[in-house]
């Protein structure tokens, strides 16, 4: 797993208080990990802070799963 | 009923420590108060649950804790104890809709607002937590309690500074009387022992500063050496229920709310009117609504904050009781736990009910030399065994708001 993926996973575990094993790439923040709409806002902020990236609102709305987050951040970092 | 206070966690633990004359007041530990004028406060002790201290994760899941200010944490702790103690677990949708919540706070999430202000001030507004607003809002204790237990009845909250707790209990009992609910979870929660809270009340010259080196002596209602109140934190919650409803399900009934009175001073933002005539009218209205005579009241839990206003409240009680004052016990339990602001009235109403249950008047600590003599026994230093059938509890708040509630054993 990439360094980014590791860090994303850690942030999700910390913010949503879920077990690490549940944070699979396919896991949906809302459907699988018990987040509500405010949790996802906070999560996106935490990603922005941790990776020093800007995630505009329209992009944030499309981040539904752990993989979505990793892909988006990897793309930003590669750019 | 449920309490979390500077004396610790849990109804019986609080009561036994109070009756034993113990103090929950100490040097502020949650932050360094050295730069502030007042160094003492009543903070909820942290430690293992079984020792009567607070381990927050036993009550609020860790991942939810950061979504709530501490006053909501403390409100949830006391509400959990109260609801579980009541045995009320509505199963049907109808019963859930007939169960409401009215928990207030004097100030709400002060530390949360302070922290958020700094984030914005530093130009990091876009980093502000989405939980900032719901963490700080006063009515969110009621909201969280309703979500936790599925109580779908009236969801309300009270904000009347230091009169909040009595107003919440009184107003909730009225909602039951009016038929809006059968059961109401009511009370107050406060957690303003933070730099901004201490600094703010210090600026208003309201806090004790002369006993920074002897914290347990700082709260001394009616004593000639008193020099201001000591802030405390905590929550007191009761479950109120329509009498026949409670009887029908065989509920444990501690007591009955029989009287409630309110008034406004229309005088000054922080100082009570001469002779505390607003307090007099609130108590008078409560006695009238209870349909009793003052001589039926055996115990008064005074507002008694350890400020100059103590003697004015005493005057108002003397005026109301007249000769019946000779048989009366009146104490201020703020001498042991400090002033819990919006939670004070609720915690003190609970103490009043336990005073009836056990026929014990809790003591006024540190009342070494009363600044004014009185025929009323103010229960100095030690608890007193005496027959108490009916008790009255007073709470008065900034803005000139006064509330009194009268309770009776069942």
UniProtKB/Swiss-Prot annotation, chain A:
<feature type="modified residue" description="O-(pantetheine 4'-phosphoryl)serine">
    <location>
        <position position="37"/>
    </location>
</feature>
<feature type="domain" description="Carrier">
    <location>
        <begin position="2"/>
        <end position="77"/>
    </location>
</feature>
<dbReference type="GO" id="GO:0009245">
    <property type="term" value="P:lipid A biosynthetic process"/>
</dbReference>
<dbReference type="GO" id="GO:0005829">
    <property type="term" value="C:cytosol"/>
</dbReference>
<dbReference type="InterPro" id="IPR006162">
    <property type="entry name" value="Ppantetheine_attach_site"/>
</dbReference>
<comment type="function">
    <text>Carrier of the growing fatty acid chain in fatty acid biosynthesis.</text>
</comment>
<protein>
    <recommendedName>
        <fullName>Acyl carrier protein</fullName>
    </recommendedName>
</protein>
<dbReference type="InterPro" id="IPR036736">
    <property type="entry name" value="ACP-like_sf"/>
</dbReference>
<keyword id="KW-0596">Phosphopantetheine</keyword>
<dbReference type="GO" id="GO:0000036">
    <property type="term" value="F:acyl carrier activity"/>
</dbReference>
<keyword id="KW-0275">Fatty acid biosynthesis</keyword>
<comment type="similarity">
    <text>Belongs to the acyl carrier protein (ACP) family.</text>
</comment>
<keyword id="KW-0963">Cytoplasm</keyword>
<dbReference type="GO" id="GO:0016020">
    <property type="term" value="C:membrane"/>
</dbReference>
<dbReference type="InterPro" id="IPR003231">
    <property type="entry name" value="ACP"/>
</dbReference>
<keyword id="KW-0443">Lipid metabolism</keyword>
<dbReference type="GO" id="GO:0000035">
    <property type="term" value="F:acyl binding"/>
</dbReference>
<keyword id="KW-0444">Lipid biosynthesis</keyword>
<keyword id="KW-0276">Fatty acid metabolism</keyword>
<comment type="pathway">
    <text>Lipid metabolism; fatty acid biosynthesis.</text>
</comment>
<dbReference type="InterPro" id="IPR009081">
    <property type="entry name" value="PP-bd_ACP"/>
</dbReference>
<keyword id="KW-0597">Phosphoprotein</keyword>
<dbReference type="Pfam" id="PF00550">
    <property type="entry name" value="PP-binding"/>
</dbReference>
